[in-house]
């Protein structure tokens, strides 16, 4: 060990610790609280896109997200009316 190395300033570990904490917090949010927020946002966006083309009762739409070890699935169930009115002429 060199005497010069002893007096030099060590690299700050704060940026690394901050980055690790952010990754940990993002993971925790995704596995607990973030899922319901994401599903709510996806539901509203999906309804907005579908409403451009056909009239759908908002109460007859369900969106569910399941997370597994390897795969996450998003299930969307929409009850369409028998006479779907087209929004645009083809």
UniProtKB/Swiss-Prot annotation:
Keywords: Cell cycle, Cell division. GO terms for biological process: cell division; regulation of division septum assembly. InterPro entries: MinE (IPR005527), MinE_sf (IPR036707). It comes from the Bacteria. Pfam families: MinE. Belongs to the MinE family. HAMAP family: MinE. Prevents the cell division inhibition by proteins MinC and MinD at internal division sites while permitting inhibition at polar sites. This ensures cell division at the proper site by restricting the formation of a division septum at the midpoint of the long axis of the cell. This is Cell division topological specificity factor. The lineage of its organism: Bacteria, Pseudomonadati, Pseudomonadota, Alphaproteobacteria, Hyphomicrobiales. The gene is minE.
């Amino acid at each position: 060990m060199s005497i010069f190395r002893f007096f030099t300033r060590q690299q700050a570990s704060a940026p690394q610790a901050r980055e690790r904490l952010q990754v940990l917090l993002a993971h925790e949010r995704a596995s607990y609280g973030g899922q319901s927020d994401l599903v709510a946002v996806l539901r509203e966006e999906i309804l907005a896109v579908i409403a451009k083309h056909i009239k759908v009762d908002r109460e007859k739409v369900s969106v569910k997200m399941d997370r597994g070890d390897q795969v996450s699935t998003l299930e969307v169930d929409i009850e369409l009316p028998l006479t779907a009115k087209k929004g645009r002429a083809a």
